[in-house]
Amino acid sequence: MVPLVQTQPLVKFLFLPLLLTTFVRAQSSSTPTTPLLSPQAAYDQAMHPLEITRSAISNWSDAELKALAIAVKQASEACGARTPEQFTGDDLIAYTRLCALGQQWPIVIIAANRYINSTDPAKPQLAQAYAFQINATEHTNDPKAILAGSLAMLKAVTYTSLTDETLYGALHYLQLAFTPEALTLYAARQPILLAALRTTQPPSPPGRAGESPVPIHTLYANGLAFAALQQFSGDPAAAAKTVAELETALPATLSPDDSIPIDETRRQYALLGTHLPVIPLTVSLFSVNETPHINTNYGDSTAFFLFPEWCAQCIRLTRQIMPTLYRINGGDGDEVHLYALLAQPPPPVDAPPKTPPKPASTKSRSVTNEPTLPEPPKTAAEQLRGTPTLIVPLATLTQFAATDFPLLIAIDPHGIIRFIQPASENTLNPGDFLDQIIMHITKQWPRQKPAAAVSPSASPNPIH
């Protein structure tokens, strides 16, 4: 028999890995870990750049645009060959959808109203009818009808993802050009959002296509959008009350799929009313050898368009900044500055030119007959040379909690951030999103101009 004293070192050796493993686990359990999104939420996040790109029809291929034009034409003809009075129930909604594809907006409104006002005891597609009606009134530019339809929808149907998407479009339409109407709609929706946040029961199962429960983080972001518009309207006290009510209504425990986007929404909202933070600038694309800078004489207003290098529609929008600057600063006394902030790694330093190879003889070229290689596609920075674009670090996207692009950041004459919101590709059109934001800022927070001020339009450079 082996003496016991000889087995003790072996026992200690065998138990040592177990002890070390226990120690490491104890250390790991005491160290807070960074919360991670669920696999589905991580997948959705990874797909978001593709969704942003595909959502802009201007990014579609010629073949897709031709197919869309054919579909719209056929739907328009099919819509005109029928009348709303021919249909009821689900067939009436199908007809409304057909006419919406054909962009026959007056008929869409008539058909949707026919379904809404019908005496049928069951209207399973009532939310769809309201969605078609409100969307059509946006296309016919009828703000009173948009507000009335949205308020009616809130009272008539459950607040699902379809209702949420419909009201998002209505509020986006109303928020700047018809701010009182937008505030009325926000105020009517807010109790519904707060009640949904306070509900502890599991969400109801999805209903019809497009009608799923609204996630907690979306409810919170929508509620905070109300506070943002209250701030933009010059009522910070009301905004603070709105935020306090939202925070009180939030559940005590949140999953990472909700807590992570809610934290991002909070960070972005917290920027409103604060001075523009320092933004590290890498390169200016406006002119060669120009030192990158942001004019701290903010004029009547300064706006930035922040986006990553993969955003194709953002690049197209940026190429329209110079004509927009000349239009806005064209003699009415306004002084507005616009910049694009291209978030990407710093451009590499150009390598010294190599000694060119000796040209091949005419005889060898004719024998090989090598095809000319196509030029590589231009980078975002190459496409934006000569525009008021500043290259900034990728961390700038995190700094402004930017998830949709381009993110428009507008500041007042004192450098205070007043507006943060994703912008569409038609934002720079005359009278559109940017013009409305600047008009509101110059009215709400006017710049104190010297009596003998020289008109900025006399300057040959509208940027600096």
Place the predicted regions along the sequence by residue.
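Short solvent-exposed coil/turn linkers within tandem alpha-helical repeat scaffolds
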Residues: 78-91, 102, 116-128, 156-167, ...
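Short active-site neighborhood of thiol/selenol oxidoreductases, capturing the structured segment around
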Residues: 290-321, 338-341
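Structural microenvironment flanking redox-active thiols in thiol-disulfide oxidoreductases
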Residues: 315-382, 391-397
